[in-house]
């Protein structure tokens, strides 16, 4: 029976995403100057104010206030009328040293015995629905806002955009779980003042449909036919959206965990990513399970896969690993048997995850908006400046968990040709 499925995304200027980006910028700076830093950093943003709190064990000394301001500046909060502006907002830091009780559970005599930073379960998901092995509704929702931010920065075709925005996409699926139609698209974008509300609504709706949508449609050759005139558009459905960002809503780190992952597909263990160094398995194991799921799909093992792993705090070996193929497996094995082979291919102890995915590098700022999954692996150079003027330039590989570097190993292990 056909059904509808919906996913949402939020822009880099959304209050919760500002908080995520500040927390991850701090992670990157700590790791740039001390790769063994242990960090758990939370951020709160509100009208004219940023509050930083968390636990750190590191040899690095940072100007956390300037790091926070730099993030805010890059996002685009550079005007006093936003009531949250990079140069003038207050930045309060309550960051302190990590608990020795927690640290003793992570640090061991040998690196291989490094324990999980906490208990919990983590999930990784992949589907052959899109080229990047992500659910289509979420993929479109992200790209709507990526392109909207690009239009804002270009400041040519659309000149009234402000940083805060949200999107939502509803797809219709057929009896075979294949997307056949875009039912509805919701876009809410912060904007400058207009002369009148009717003029504002008319202009924004026209620009979204005639400028934004074609840019997004061009990225989906396979699904271009889904972008038709039957789509229901809800553009700024509440009307005026001048007051936004942290002045409109308080933002906190870790409140957009479904946007960060699979848009409601698969499952989520509940642990947020941003502000956590890779010793926290909430983050590292979620990346590792995505890496597994994506390589299983790319190898042709199944059409859809959910991988679960769980840990006990201070224990290196996972307490469980489970693979769910939703009945789409192409090999004549039970999901239980598939799970056992996956466990042999991928070492899921925290230290080995860190090494395999190169997670002790400053690679996290780029993850903090528009999804941690489904992104393109790439090598870039990043430069960091310490308060004493020390400059560090590092060549790092982003989104290593998106690499298809285990496809051959998976095919060999499962006898897939």
Sequence positions of predicted segments:
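N-terminal, positively charged regions that mediate nucleic acid binding
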Residues: 1-40, 155, 407, 413
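Glycine-rich, mobile lid/loop segments that gate access to catalytic sites or pores
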Residues: 6, 48, 66, 73-243, ...
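Conserved phosphate/anionic-ligand binding catalytic regions in large, soluble enzymes, centered on
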Residues: 8-10, 14-19, 115-130, 242-267, ...
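Alpha-helical support elements that line or immediately flank enzyme active sites
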Residues: 12-31, 129-150, 276-300
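A short glycine-rich, hydrophobically flanked beta-strand micro-motif that places a catalytic Asp/Glu
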Residues: 37-41, 165-171, 231-235, 301-312
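Short, charge-patterned binding micro-sites
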Residues: 39-58, 313-317
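Internal helix-turn-beta structural module
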Residues: 46, 304, 311-417
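Glycine-rich anion/phosphate-binding loop at the beta-strand->alpha-helix junction
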Residues: 196-297
